[in-house]
Amino acid sequence: MSELKNDRYLRALLRQPVDVTPVWMMRQAGRYLPEYKETRAQAGDFISLCKNTELACEVTLQPLRRFPLDAAILFSDILTIPDAMGLGLYFETGEGPRFKTPINSLDDIKKLPIPDPEDELGYVMNAVRAIRHALQGNVPLIGFSGSPWTLATYMIEGGSSKAFTKIKKMMYSEPQALHLLLDKLADSVILYLNAQIKAGAQSIMIFDTWGGVLTGRDYQLFSLQYMHKIVDGLIRENEGRKVPVTLFTKGGGRWLEAMAATGCDALGLDWTIDIEDARRRVGDKVALQGNMDPSMLYAPPARIEQEVATILAGFGKGTGHVFNLGHGIHQDVPPAHAGAFIDAVHRLSKPYHQDND
């Protein structure tokens, strides 16, 4: 594997000195880029794009050709594991992801296989290997998975949900069934992420998109407990370097201390959290990633720059901050605005790291 030329993203996650604050964007390979739309059209649909090694590699690299980003993230979907378990993932226009055979009972859960990452999910590992090779050591590659709780919400609801009544019904009336599902998912995620690391992923992110819909007690029991199990089961060093792990619970600002206690290296913050407050609470234990409101990218570049300056000042001096949006970039954002955002982070963050030169 090529020697890493720009490692500031990995260094910041491990709270080691950096020259400027590193930056990448959730969903940086996506529909806001015209070249992505062309490649997706070529693939036919989203799932075919994920499963085509060459095209998944191409869309991963597209934002890096445009912008001086400090990391690449594997182009894939969080629902690859439930799909590999046989639930039949498909996408309904305007509806988002759906499953042909959602989970309805304890029997359904008992029958679920734990997918082999090099077999049913081999297409993901092929993409990781191809992307890692194509990056030529320019920037690190982030691998990822959905959290067990978030995967379970889609598997039980049958797709996206607003009220989460089906999974909450199981959680409160058949908790042992839900725990069995979450345990199977945690085991599957450990295998899946470790396979990504062996294939070349240099950092790992766990997306807990729906943890924020839970009460504090239920979050600990049904979401965080299983992310903790995953953190404990991951390969944390590969190719002579540490492999940092970031946990991101959207709506999880109340639980940063508990999240930091899992042994992860960093926490992703959504835009509803004050980064200064977050650093005060957990900055001595973990790095922080985030957390500009993705909708700020609709604003004129001067306003974007102002927001970047505010967030940098909120975090303050020194390392331990990876700049990002608080969630994925919206599909109708002008690419030039994303470029202005990335440039502003690098330019304006220099003074915060001067003691490190």
UniProtKB/Swiss-Prot annotation:
<feature type="site" description="Transition state stabilizer">
    <location>
        <position position="77"/>
    </location>
</feature>
<feature type="binding site">
    <location>
        <position position="327"/>
    </location>
    <ligand>
        <name>substrate</name>
    </ligand>
</feature>
<feature type="binding site">
    <location>
        <position position="77"/>
    </location>
    <ligand>
        <name>substrate</name>
    </ligand>
</feature>
<keyword id="KW-0456">Lyase</keyword>
<keyword id="KW-0210">Decarboxylase</keyword>
<dbReference type="InterPro" id="IPR038071">
    <property type="entry name" value="UROD/MetE-like_sf"/>
</dbReference>
<dbReference type="InterPro" id="IPR006361">
    <property type="entry name" value="Uroporphyrinogen_deCO2ase_HemE"/>
</dbReference>
<comment type="similarity">
    <text>Belongs to the uroporphyrinogen decarboxylase family.</text>
</comment>
<keyword id="KW-0627">Porphyrin biosynthesis</keyword>
<feature type="binding site">
    <location>
        <position position="209"/>
    </location>
    <ligand>
        <name>substrate</name>
    </ligand>
</feature>
<feature type="binding site">
    <location>
        <begin position="27"/>
        <end position="31"/>
    </location>
    <ligand>
        <name>substrate</name>
    </ligand>
</feature>
<comment type="subunit">
    <text>Homodimer.</text>
</comment>
<dbReference type="Pfam" id="PF01208">
    <property type="entry name" value="URO-D"/>
</dbReference>
<dbReference type="GO" id="GO:0005829">
    <property type="term" value="C:cytosol"/>
</dbReference>
<dbReference type="GO" id="GO:0019353">
    <property type="term" value="P:protoporphyrinogen IX biosynthetic process from glutamate"/>
</dbReference>
<feature type="binding site">
    <location>
        <position position="154"/>
    </location>
    <ligand>
        <name>substrate</name>
    </ligand>
</feature>
<dbReference type="InterPro" id="IPR000257">
    <property type="entry name" value="Uroporphyrinogen_deCOase"/>
</dbReference>
<protein>
    <recommendedName>
        <fullName>Uroporphyrinogen decarboxylase</fullName>
        <ecNumber>4.1.1.37</ecNumber>
    </recommendedName>
</protein>
<keyword id="KW-0963">Cytoplasm</keyword>
<dbReference type="GO" id="GO:0004853">
    <property type="term" value="F:uroporphyrinogen decarboxylase activity"/>
</dbReference>
<comment type="function">
    <text>Catalyzes the decarboxylation of four acetate groups of uroporphyrinogen-III to yield coproporphyrinogen-III.</text>
</comment>
<comment type="pathway">
    <text>Porphyrin-containing compound metabolism; protoporphyrin-IX biosynthesis; coproporphyrinogen-III from 5-aminolevulinate: step 4/4.</text>
</comment>
